[in-house]
């Protein structure tokens, strides 16, 4: 029987630990279990984060093992080699697929029946690997995808327009990586098309400005890694938001990575497209309006991911 207030984090690196810290403050769970190959690391992180519980809400945070996944509502997998300066996310494929081959079968052995959230990179590839290795229904295996990329885009647009980023509605779709696509055609600020809002705010070089913003968003992870060796706060907040949507059955629309079938002539590959997300995971895709150029770039992104999947032996 699933404990609807229990989450498990697999791997206590920068991303995993920051995500647990964010989840501790969310009030979503009363039990959070940390699993790591280094048991001392898991115990230390659990102790440290637990000391913040008096400032949050009552819960248990502790180091555990794979038996703890059996009744968990959500298992978050952040395990994987980190991205180094100069590396792309796709450079991590072989190393992190090997790690997933050791982790996912352990989860499957426990008859896990909750939602699996993949956060490790390359997230689109690893989400599809997790589906194949776990045997779980596709709707219950979700990748963090371009949730963070889209948040970065909204932040940059809000900064550019001097408006609250929460009023900006814009998605990055496709790969969480170098072939990502900004869906400019559907971008708006509280219902006002982005190009119109730019002019209203005194910005008349719309194409040049949006191109600069898209480049800044795409390169932001590389820039952060070059400066501080890892990114973890932004993705931790993304993990918290995805967990909120699932645990509260919000049916919110998020650009998470999931298996795509028949949207924009794409089939049989995991990538990010806006989807309705709730207690059962992915409910349905939302095929947002794209220009011909955007649809072509999305197809190219999907094809590049497919080619990589074809090289992986599972």
Task: Enumerate the predicted regions with their spans.
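Glycine-rich Rossmann-fold phosphate-binding loop(s) that bind the pyrophosphate
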Residues: 12-13
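Conserved S-adenosyl-L-methionine
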Residues: 25-31, 135-138
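N-terminal Rossmann-fold NAD(P) dinucleotide-binding loop
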Residues: 16-17
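Rossmann-like NAD(P)(H) cofactor-binding subdomain of soluble oxidoreductases
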Residues: 88-154
């Amino acid at each position: 029987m699933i404990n609807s207030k229990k989450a498990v984090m697999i791997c206590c690196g920068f991303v995993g630990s920051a995500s647990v810290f964010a989840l501790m403050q969310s009030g979503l769970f009363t039990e959070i279990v940390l699993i790591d190959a280094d048991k001392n690391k898991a115990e230390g992180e659990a102790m440290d984060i637990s000391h913040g519980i008096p400032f949050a809400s009552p819960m248990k945070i502790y180091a555990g093992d794979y038996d703890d996944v059996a009744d968990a509502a959500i298992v978050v997998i952040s395990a994987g080699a980190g991205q180094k300066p100069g590396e792309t996310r796709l450079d991590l494929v072989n190393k992190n697929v090997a790690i997933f081959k050791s982790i996912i079968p352990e989860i499957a052995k426990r008859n896990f029946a909750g939602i699996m959230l993949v956060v490790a990179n390359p997230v689109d590839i690893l989400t599809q690997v997790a589906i194949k290795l776990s045997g779980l229904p596709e709707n219950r295996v979700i990748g963090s995808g371009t949730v963070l990329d889209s948040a970065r885009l909204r932040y940059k647009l809000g900064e550019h327009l001097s408006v609250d980023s929460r009023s900006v509605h814009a998605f990055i779709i496709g790969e969480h990586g170098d072939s990502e696509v900004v869906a400019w055609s559907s971008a708006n600020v509280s219902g006002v098309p982005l190009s119109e809002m730019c002019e209203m705010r005194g910005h008349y070089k719309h194409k040049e400005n949006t191109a600069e913003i898209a480049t800044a968003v795409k390169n932001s992870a590389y820039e952060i890694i070059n400066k501080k060796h890892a990114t973890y706060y932004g993705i931790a907040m993304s993990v918290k938001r995805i967990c909120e949507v699932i645990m509260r059955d919000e049916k919110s629309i998020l650009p998470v990575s999931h298996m795509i079938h028949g949207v924009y002539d794409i089939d049989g590959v995991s990538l990010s497209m806006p989807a309705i997300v709730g207690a059962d995971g992915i409910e349905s895709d939302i095929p947002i309006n794209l220009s011909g150029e955007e649809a072509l770039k999305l197809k190219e992104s999907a094809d590049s991911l497919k080619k990589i999947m074809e090289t992986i032996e599972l």
